[in-house]
Amino acid sequence: MKQIILTGDRPTGRLHVGHYVGSLKERVRLQNSGKFDEIYIMIADAQALTDNADNPEKVRQNILQVALDYLAVGIDPAKAHIFIQSMVPELTELSFYYMNLVTVSRLQRNPTVKAEIQQKNFETSIPVGFFTYPISQAADITAFRATTVPAGEDQMPMLEQCREIVHKCNVVYGETLTEPEILLPSNHACLRLPGIDGKAKMSKSLGNCIYLSDEPEDIKKKIMSMYTDPGHLRVQDPGKVEGNPVFTYLDAFSRPEHFAEFLPEYQNLDELKAHYQRGGLGDVKIKKFLNAVMQAELEPIRTRRKEWEQRLPEVVEILKEGSAVAEQTAAATLADVRKSMRIDYFTDNNLLK
């Protein structure tokens, strides 16, 4: 069986470091591993419209921003198909068929949907498209026969929902769809990077992000304002590492060579944590170190992004070509699904059989 990846992002804003450590970095590694036959990376504009229907211009303007971020982190269009979701209409038809296999009560139990409904204040007025987007995601995944979906842990309920749809479809109509597996980041700190304000999720809508395209002075300003341990009032006070975003970011980004270059009095992160926990280490010092680490990590990404910004017609062509390949693949899957449901009425005069 072919090994195929499907992953993507909603174009509601530029991508941030939470995206980077949660999935983008892993996508580049997988892309270059040679272990996968096909890789599809989707700019999920249709899904973004489920809670931005009154502002489609916001979605439209961010399609190129997300594409630029992909290319900046190292996604290679020669190895991965970058495409726009709404340019593959077969996904909508697949979603429509899958809706008949899922109950309202099952959608209501999805913890990711429940959390996002609360965050977006949709409790009393949930758009139907938003409520059913886990079904749309299942269509996205199955249309490309994805075997692997690299994603953060917050997407695990979505993958479970998708696997249920695949199972039911295969039982009711015959073996047609491929059951996917989620691939989580190996570094626990990367599973879900908190916002700079200490909130559980880094989110564009909460304004607590460090963007991949941020300028150096903006990154420094955000890091120096980061939430830390509220009980660590004086340098000599013992500090808490658990739940401290500065150390969570260091877990995700720092490497031994960073200590040798920027903070040679410590050999590694464990030594730095131990000093902070016993007292005598101030927040400003660890924030300055984090700033140095993140500047080193993000500078080459920012440079590549600026280079691609000078080649926008080429970026559009990459999206066109990727979308054409994606539509061809999705059309083949849709044909198989229609055949399994026996609704391919005009193929070989099937309506007469």
PLM-predicted stretches and their roles:
Residues 2-139, 257, 296-298, 302, ...:
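N-terminal Rossmann-like or analogous alpha/beta NTP/dinucleotide-binding catalytic cores
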Residues 1-3, 346-347:
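Extreme N-terminus of proteins, especially the signal/transit-peptide cleavage junction
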Residues 157, 163-353:
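Conserved nucleotide- and phosphate/pyrophosphate-binding catalytic cores
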Residues 113-115, 119-169, 173, 194-195:
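Internal, conserved structured core segments that host functional sites
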